[in-house]
Amino acid sequence: MSNGSDKAGWLTSVTLGPEYDEELEHTLSCWVSGVSGLPDDKVRSRWTSVQSPPLPVDDDGCDFGIMAFISDVTPAFENQTEESTELWRHEEIECLVSFYGPNCQRYGTCFRDGLAVSQNNDELGRFGLSVDKSSQLTALPELINNQWVRRYDMTITLRRKVVREYGVKSLVEAPVKFFGD
């Protein structure tokens, strides 16, 4: 495997880039908790390897999950140095957020309205994220163990800039011979 353009082979990023996986999910959990007003332990990531037990029907809570990463079509290559260049692109992160329990409307609408508060967006910006758009809050009650559980869902699209560094060397000199007259 090559990690520089001075040798043949595949190039992988030499920097990690932004948060993904559990780190990103932890950041999103703190964000949803902080903006909605739900306690930290009541906001849970969906689709984890270890599933949390379901909340009691009379308890309020929220599950969220990242449904898609959507990138812009054309990345830009910037900051070329002798040793590397940076790939810049913008990425959208589409999240499904579900509020459960007897006060799910209250927490869902508090979260929805909190998305418009500039201080909340500034705090989210510390993690390189911003709210791009959100859907309406939609009722989707679930029948679990022959009991209706109140549930309201919304989709949030976050946006961020992704920067990755690659070992693409700059061309400093190239030996050239001209033939002819």
Regions found by a protein language model. Give the residues of each.
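Small/polar-rich, solvent-exposed N-terminal microdomains that initiate assembly or binding
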Residues: 1-81, 172, 176-181
